[in-house]
């Protein structure tokens, strides 16, 4: 709601485009983005509940805005969208219920984290690595890439203190690349752990 990038993007768009409309998704009703567009007939601000983020990473806010964007812009039926929300809620409850198990599995003296995601998971991989970088205050080195791109140089980032997460795509063709890089990194026996994240 107050990021210089968001506000600058709106100002540049207003300058460059003669006929433009804005859809603002924010959880900050007092933010400049919401306030400055309140009386603008070419702007619609959709406020979402605050996610009670306590840190700089804003993981809850990001998750809510990502979900809302999908619900707004995807052409699926309302019934299908409701099913997605229900499935996401169930997955979230399962993760919370298994928090101790997950924490124990991921415990260790790691200093590097890599996220790999292809296709629709490319942006998620980038955001995930950014969140780790922010939450660890830069003390954990992070990287992200696609499954195909990673093997062509960036894989040299992996050492024996690296956790590698691969978001495994549901698309059958893309999934082959994701599973292949999982097996390749696991077979190298260098990374501390290689973890598949999938449904």
Protein language model features and the residues they cover:
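Glycine-rich phosphate-binding loops that contact phosphosugars or nucleotide phosphates
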Residues: 1-84, 167-198
